[in-house]
Amino acid sequence: MGLFSGKRPDGLGFHTDSKAGGNMAGAFKPCSWKPNCVNSTADQTADAAHYIRPFNVSGDAAKAWATAVALVKAVPRVSVVTESATYLYAQYRSKLMGYVDDVELALDASAKVIHVRSASRLGVRDFGANRARVERLRAKLAAAPAS
C-alpha cells in the first residue's frame, strides 16, 4: 500500500456483545491514548478528548444510511473495505504522503443514529484531521435532501 499506510488495526467493527474484542455492547474499538482518533461510542465524560457525537437520523434510517455511505464513497482517495446494511469500513488515504486513516460507520436504527469512528494509523497527532473529517461528513449528511 505504501510507506506511510501503516498496518490495518485489529479489532475493527461494531461489536454488539461484550465478548467481541473486549468492547462494551454496541461499540467500536476504543481509541488509544493518542489524540488522533474520534469515536462516538467513547464515554462522553471519561474519554471526552476522543468523543464525538453520532450522526442523528431523521426520517427513514435506511435512506439516511444509504446517503451516508454514498457521501463516504464520493470522497477522493477512499477505499471501501467492508459494507453491509448497517456497517461501513473505509480507508482514507492522504493526498500528499499517502497516510491511511480508518473510518467506520454503524447504523443504529432503533436509536436513530449513525455511530462513527475515525482514526489515524500512524503518528501521534493528527492536528484535528479526523474530527474535521467527521464534522464535514455530518454537515454534508445534514444538507443532503431527504429521500
Question: Which positions does each model-derived feature cover?
Answer:
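Ser/Thr-rich, low-complexity intrinsically disordered terminal regions
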Residues: 1-147
